[in-house]
Amino acid sequence: MLKEGLEYTSEVVVTPANCASAVGSGGLDVFATPSMVALMENAAMNCVAPYLPEGSTTVGTEICTTHIKPSALGATIKAVAKLTAVEGRKLLFDVEAYDGDNCIGKGTHVRFIVDIERFMSKL
C-alpha cells in the first residue's frame, strides 16, 4: 500500500560515462548533475513500484534539486527517496544524494501514477 514514509536507496559508482564531461553538462570528470537527478528519480520510481496496480507505472513531472558538492571518479553515490505525500495519483518525494556520509545534493520530486497502455497511446 502506498503510504507516506516509504523509502528506497539507489546506488551508482562514478564512471567516465556519468561524468559532466560525458553527458554534456560540463567539462570536468566529476559526477554530473543530470546523473544525480536520474539517480534520484530512479530511487523514487523504485520506492513505489512494488505498490502499484498491474499495468501501471510512475512518470516524473517535476524535480527541484541543489547539487552541493562534487564527487570524483570511483566514488559510490547513493540517492535516497522518501515518499512524503500521496495525493491521488500525485506522489511527492524528498530526495537526497550522498557520497559516503557527505550530502552532495537534495531536493523534491513529483511523480504521477499512470496506466502504461493509456499513457503510451497518447504519444
Where are these regions (language model features)?
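C-terminal binding/interaction regions
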Residues: K3-T9, V86-F93, D99-S121
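Hydrophobic residues in beta-strands and at strand termini
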Residues: V14-P16, H67, I113
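Catalytic strand-loop segment that frames the active site of acyl-thioester-processing enzymes
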Residues: M1-F31
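Short, charged, solvent-exposed linker or helix-capping segments at domain edges/interfaces
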Residues: A22-G24, M120-L123
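Hydrophobic beta-strand-centered segment that forms part of the acyl-chain substrate-binding groove
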Residues: M45-K78
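Hydrophobic beta-sheet segments that form the core/acyl-binding groove
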Residues: T65-G100
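Conserved N-terminal beta-strand and adjoining loop/helix that marks the start
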Residues: P34-V37
